[in-house]
Amino acid sequence: MAVSGLAGCSGKNSDNNSSAVSTVSVSESSAVSETADDESSYNKTVSSADSSPAPSDNISSAAQSSEESSKETSDKTSNETSNQDSVNEETSIAPEPSSKNAEESQKVQESSQISQPSKSDEKSEPEQKPESKPEPEPVTPDIPANDNDIGGIELYNELFRIENKVSVEISIDKSETDKLQADYLKYTGRNEAKKSEIYRKADLTVKVGNKSYTIDEVGIRMKGNQSLEPFYAQNGTPNICSFKLSFDETFDDKDEYGSSAKTWTDDKARKARKKRTFATLNEMDIKWNICYDNTNIREIYAAKLFESANVLVQKIGLSQLSINGNNYGLVKIYEPIDKNFLEKRLPESALGGDLYKCIWSDCNNSGKHTGRWRGATYKTDNSYGVQDNSEGIKYNFNLKTNKKSSDNESLKKFLNVINKSNVSKAELEQVLDVDYYASFMAASYFAGDPDDIRNNYNNHYLYFRKDNGKAIFIVYDNDRTLGITYGLNKNCATRNPYSSYAATQSAQENPIIKKTITHDTTAEFMYIRDKYASELKKLSQTEMLTSDADFNKMYNTAKSNYEGIITPYIRFANQEEIFQFSLNGNKNGGDRANMSFEQFRSQIMQTYNSSKP
């Protein structure tokens, strides 16, 4: 299957058209609607390649319903969005607006609802779609509009399009970077299991094509586990770091900020800040190329592979990163997996369930460190709870929703059922979406990540649907995929898809996998292995795996947009290799090199074609 949306790649785009855009200051207070209880909603027209519903009847019917309703509202939505964008091509969100700005921005807000084209719109016909952008298909139900959002669902889609040139510019005072450094030394520097969850203050400008969005007082903190580094090395040279951005941080928690806690004089403005989102996101992650993938797109391509299998996966894009005017090179930007993520992909009836991040931990259910590290193997002795990063308390299953109300009963029931020696088909299907599971495991096999649910019992999310209580899995942190072996050489291209072993060569521990898709599958669940085999066959016949063409097309688009900024302004203290664009690889390079995508694809297809259940 070809990668949707790659035809007619735009090539290199200009990121600065300031002379052609109008500058409007929209204050936070004006963004607070006087009709907050308005039941209006915006239609999320996300293309099928950009959003991936689970393959269940409920989700399919929701998609169909949304498509029918969108026919009535698509013209209105596109007109309103077009006018809003023409006004807000450069949008500045101020932390504490003046009354004058509030009045001006209220006028802008009102005028933006009038369906008249701007001067730039008169030069083209908005209703005609460029050939490079296929007609989007609505695949998700509506969610309520957020009057405090910047950019909306249209920006959400454009932000992660590989064809668009994106830049993230962070402006942060030295006093704040010093606090980031102190946060690291206070927590992670003494115990690698701990890390600070305190956000420091920065201003942010995001450019998408020729549109620019500036947001004041964005929260920023460093992120990562073993990859987490201090902001500065001991010699004062900057490290290249990964970051988490928060768009709704209020900076007024005295326990976290002490005497520097922000004092809000306008309660309305504070409430607006708590609801502020950017491109419908509460947060956004920024990660550097820690595995030195010279194609710079493998994780993005893998996400497209999962989408083609109708598996839930976060949106991932590329962006230039600069901090205080210094070019930090090319990074990846990520949609977080949270309530917003689920709302975009599942029908309303499925929302409200428990969401868990599944990782390695040495904690028991009491939050005590046992010294025995283990992955999320789905055994009954795995731990679960609400993590506390500042205390280094993490569980195998870290609850991300319903933190105050959940009794974890869905998870406990799930673990008990899948670990029964004589579990029946009816019992398993009561707690597991079998069709979705087969698709998830098939796509995971071809992605070839040695650090995933099957090979290292790590890096995925587990969600229990509210409507039927069934478990589905969500892809996460696939940065070691499609032939990336740098730092962890467990070549998954040679693994039999039905193997009873993990990539570590140890016997498979996950009871779901053992019972359903391996050589050890019992007669009771042979039908699941057949579903898995069918999904493997479907994926193996798609253009994404039978040819390098789609991958090379995406690569050339990324290279065209970002080759000029791939080299950072300085060699970072923790940088081990140069950053570059290249399709070359070395499959015999050990853990200091990556095989090429061509080598990986060829090898895993050879392994698959010669395998037998």
Residue ranges and their predicted role:
Residues I290-V311:
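A conserved alpha-helical element in kinase catalytic cores
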Residues P144-D149, K165, D178-L180, E391-N396, ...:
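Middle-to-C-terminal accessory/interaction subdomains
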Residues V3-V26:
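Sec-dependent signal peptide cleavage junction
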Residues L204-W288:
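Conserved oxyanion/phosphate-binding beta-strand-loop segments in alpha/beta enzyme cores
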Residues A309-L321, I453:
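Short, well-structured beta-strand/strand-turn elements
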Residues V3-G5, C9-G11, K133-M222, N556-P613:
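Regulatory N- and C-terminal appendages and interdomain linkers associated
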